[in-house]
Amino acid sequence: GFPAQEDGAASLSGGNSGNIIVPVNGGGDFLLMAHMDTPRSIKGVKPQLLADRITSDGTTILGVDDRGGISVILWALRQAVEQKKAIKPCTLLFSVCEETTLAGSMFYQPSAQMTHGFVFDSHLSPGKFVSETCGAIAFKMKVKGRASHAGVAPEKGVNAIQIAAEGMRNFPFGRIDACTTANIGIIGGGTATNVVPDTVELEGEIRTDYLDQGEQMMQAVIADFEAAAIRLNGSVECAWHWDFKPYRVSPDNTPYKRMEALCRHLSLEMEGVKSMGGSDANNMNAKGLPTINLGVGAQYPHGTDEFILYDDLQMSADMALALLTEI
């Protein structure tokens, strides 16, 4: 076997497990990665083995996002050992909290000898991979007014909902251009219909390919809310951060070149695509490790109709085996 260790990512994520790290033959210069958490509970999952695919029974998700990725990496390692194939020095990383905060990959620090990585976590079919993504800013606003009786003394109150509505007047909801979106998805406040609400809290995001553009948009949003608060005699607090930063792995980067060779070796049609979603690959690229997210073929992830085709699962496993031993 190979030694496995657990790091301290649980301290960052607030979970009960850290990342599992498996250095293979010294750890090598590349990473194979998948995440251990699932987007929703898989308690009571009952996998159904159909003629061409694996599904759940429809009452839970299947959890192939990303148990599929874990399975193909472990299968490939086992096959390499059993077939007595020479295994390239590399590191296997099984991360935590990918679905919520990417906290596991945020905590992990690649060694100095690492040059590139592969994440097995995309819903795309094998041969396709995510070579570039947007980044996402997450923000929280707390709008403060002053409570008062809405019928007896409304003049003494400052309505936080009114301030929030004014602040959102110019918010660019939806798709702004081909690589930029914005949304406020959570809002809440007030205690009763006869009380002028003194607090409203809301949460949103901005997704974009460009760091500068994202931060400029965020500052414009803050300015709109602050202007509304000043005009209506309230105040606003804002906290924001990059949930994940954008990346682009170009064709001259090592993982892209290895993917080209891999697809030729397995007679697969290769396609690098752009995604508006994030993955552990975003954090690896942000740490200076060129990393692409490979298609495993998990269809309808996050839903109770999630499934994976046997052919896609086997091809993904063959890809992992080739990366470990040949390509």
Label every PLM stretch briefly.
Residues 6, 13-94, 111-114, 315:
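Active-site metal-coordination/substrate-binding segment of hydrolases
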Residues 29-31, 52-54, 90-91, 115-118, ...:
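Structural motif
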Residues 33-35, 93-95, 118-121, 142-144, ...:
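Short beta-strand segments
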Residues 37-52, 129-142, 261, 292:
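Acidic-glycine-rich active-site phosphate/pyrophosphate-binding loop
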Residues 49-61, 142-148, 266, 298-302:
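Glycine/charged-rich beta-loop-alpha catalytic/anionic-binding loops adjacent to active sites
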Residues 58-138, 176, 182, 186, ...:
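Acidic/histidine-rich catalytic neighborhood of metal-dependent amide-processing enzymes
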Residues 127-130, 148-155, 191, 246:
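A short glycine-threonine-serine/GTX helix/turn-capping micro-motif
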Residues 142, 159-327:
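Metal-dependent amide/peptide-bond hydrolase catalytic core
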